[in-house]
Amino acid sequence: MVRLLASEVQQLLHNKFVVVLGDSVHRAVYKDLVLLLQKDCLLTNKQLRTKGELSFEKDQLMMGGELDTLHNRTDYREVREFCSDHHLVRFYFLTRVYSEYMESVLKELQSGNHAPDVIIMNSCLWDVSRYGRNSLSSYRQNLENLFGRMDEVLPKSCLLVWNTAMPLGDKIKAAFLPQKCKGQYPRISVATLKKKVTQANFYSHAEATKHYFDVLDLNFHFRQARKHLQGDGVHWNEHAHRKLSYLLLAHMADAWGVELPHRDPWEPGFEAWESSGQVEERQPQDNIGPQFAQSPPYPFPRPPPLLPSPGLPIRPPPLLGCPLPPPQPMPPLPLYPQVSYFSSDPVFQSDEFYIHSDSPSSNHTGYAFEGDFSFYPQPPMPNFRPPCHQRQAPVVHRGFPRHFPRGPYMPWRERPRRPQKHAPACLESRPQ
């Protein structure tokens, strides 16, 4: 897992315009990026739950929220923006993947002074739960309209990352879901909602790759991390959102060809971030005693132990066996040139990620599965690095195979050339 400090995130997003589009889950994605651009700390539970505030960590509420009225209707609006000397991050709250409001957002991005460099987007839960019984079919049609317009409006240098909807809990108590009251649709069951989310993720993945956009499968990454869910069964705690930010930043670095630093996963600065999966309100920093003081932001690597632990008994040396006769000389073998072993896939270490193909697994349709992410530090392992240099990359679905352009300033979303088909050569009869 790639772990980044605030100074490194500032360098990666230097002079970049990042746009986040989505619901309340992606509002927390926006907040964690804004926080990580300024300091090395996590979001508090209060910051995660608050919506529509006038200011958050030096950002500004541009429209909606507390400037208008806080409610849970489908016409809720909230636009936030964080702007510094070299960074610009903007958030648009969406209740539907494509609508008249989404069209106005696209026109605003197209006519603005700065074209977006990165767009992080997801819209699913509101679409499949608040727009009637045929919401899934309309969601599929809206996906086609959205990605078609994105392909027309966005410049080829813009990196669009579509996030799949994250897993849901067994008990859902989110406030935006429809209630059993007069004039509204009946409350959807948890099993039905989970099934709709799975189908919606499949449709969005297929439509995004059809238009050569990237897909980050958050449903896969967090499928076994439900202990980091909030009590409502929809939103996630600060540890999960920091993991999510790392995945997004590693995806951007891989797309731009930026080499990220290789950091020891056992650094104490990151141990504290992932050591807890509880969802409790954290105490202020003034109440923390000296024994719980946080580690410095730039810790030194932990040296390996020189002597065995005093609590463990020292094993005696093994007994020597009977002396063996000297080996007989072998006849000389003919010398042949050494054949190196080549593999079609690059070799990755256990603490690195890889980019897998788009071929679906045999057990699940439309998704590829790998090893789980660990939210707790693992026992230290000896660091044996191969002689060759290897890049870290997140597990992502690529809309097209990796293509290396000729020049350094080629567009990002350029479609690969189709291979030319040659006529089959005539088969000649072999001499008997």
Curated annotation (Swiss-Prot):
Detail the disulphide connectivity of this chain as listed in its UniProt entry: none
Q: List the biased-composition ranges (Polar residues).
A: 285-294
InterPro entries per UniProt = SGNH_hydro_sf
**Residue spans of biased composition, Pro residues class:** 296-312
Chain positions covered by the region annotation Disordered: 273-312, 407-432
Family membership: Belongs to the PC-esterase family.
Q: Which PANTHER family match?
A: PC-ESTERASE DOMAIN-CONTAINING PROTEIN 1B, SARCOMA ANTIGEN NY-SAR-23
Recorded protein name is PC-esterase domain-containing protein 1B
- Species this chain originates from: Rattus norvegicus
